[in-house]
Amino acid sequence: MKLRGLYAITDSQLLAGKFLAYVEAALDGGVTLLQYRDKSSDEARRLREAEKLRELCSRYKTQLIINDDAELAARLGVGVHLGQTDGPLTPARALLGSKAIIGSTCHSQIELAEQAAKEGASYVAFGRFFNSNTKPGAPAATVEMLAQARARVQLPICVIGGITLENAEPLVAHGADLLAVVHGLFGADSTQEVTRRARAFNDLLKISV
């Protein structure tokens, strides 16, 4: 499977009261990967929401990714995204199997991406590239670094951090395969606007939905 397209990431606070409606609106516009990101300790609720997302993703032929929780991903039979504080990828690969999608946060360090590739990552993520509400303290990445990463890393490259329709084009031009978006997608006033934005991100990547 070629990993290229819009990578939608949920935010529980941003989507409060409209969670499934906005997610489905995004899926309707075309989403390659959907990451369920919820840092709360309410495991029962997280399982409930993740199961609903798995059902939606199945309907729209989108791959579901769980943030930072390989055990939940294994329980649901979906992929996982791991940060640098979540340990090596090898145990997650062993747990989830050879076909699961596993992503790795690499901040702005190409060496981390090369290591992740050796450990069996499906894609690597660099960022933040712009000011971000979700990760305000994350180390900054540059388009120059992205171009270098594209030359050195064979895996699909995901970019994250304050990405909007207005600033995404240079990232695509410098080698990004996946545009990871939170507020730039879900910070919309209506489900119709979420769908429009999703389609517009796919247009930037020359992907027809």
From Swiss-Prot:
The pathway to which it is assigned is: Cofactor biosynthesis; thiamine diphosphate biosynthesis; thiamine phosphate from 4-amino-2-methyl-5-diphosphomethylpyrimidine and 4-methyl-5-(2-phosphoethyl)-thiazole: step 1/1
* Chemical reaction(s) catalysed: 2-[(2R,5Z)-2-carboxy-4-methylthiazol-5(2H)-ylidene]ethyl phosphate + 4-amino-2-methyl-5-(diphosphooxymethyl)pyrimidine + 2 H(+) = thiamine phosphate + CO2 + diphosphate; 2-(2-carboxy-4-methylthiazol-5-yl)ethyl phosphate + 4-amino-2-methyl-5-(diphosphooxymethyl)pyrimidine + 2 H(+) = thiamine phosphate + CO2 + diphosphate; 4-methyl-5-(2-phosphooxyethyl)-thiazole + 4-amino-2-methyl-5-(diphosphooxymethyl)pyrimidine + H(+) = thiamine phosphate + diphosphate
Give the binding site residues for 2-[(2R,5Z)-2-carboxy-4-methylthiazol-5(2H)-ylidene]ethyl phosphate: 132-134, 162
InterPro entries according to UniProt: Aldolase_TIM, ThiamineP_synth_sf, ThiamineP_synth_TenI, TMP_synthase
Question: Where, in this chain's numbering, is Mg(2+) bound?
Answer: 68, 86
Keyword Metal-binding: yes or no?
A: yes
Keywords on this record? Answer: Magnesium, Metal-binding, Thiamine biosynthesis, Transferase
Positions of 4-amino-2-methyl-5-(diphosphooxymethyl)pyrimidine binding: 35-39, 67, 105, 135
Question: Any note on cofactor binding?
Answer: Binds 1 Mg(2+) ion per subunit.
CDD domains linked to this entry: TMP_TenI
- Look up the domain of life of the source: Bacteria
Give this protein's Gene Ontology molecular function annotations.
Answer: magnesium ion binding; thiamine-phosphate diphosphorylase activity
EC number of this enzyme:
2.5.1.3
Q: Key word Iron present in the record?
A: no
State the Gene Ontology BP annotations. Answer: thiamine biosynthetic process; thiamine diphosphate biosynthetic process
Look up the record and report any one GO term of the cellular component aspect: cytoplasm
Function (record text)? Condenses 4-methyl-5-(beta-hydroxyethyl)thiazole monophosphate (THZ-P) and 2-methyl-4-amino-5-hydroxymethyl pyrimidine pyrophosphate (HMP-PP) to form thiamine monophosphate (TMP).
Recorded family membership = Belongs to the thiamine-phosphate synthase family.
Entry protein name:
Thiamine-phosphate synthase
This chain's source organism reads: Pseudomonas fluorescens (strain SBW25)
The organism's taxonomy opens as: Bacteria, Pseudomonadati, Pseudomonadota, Gammaproteobacteria, Pseudomonadales
What gene is behind this protein? thiE
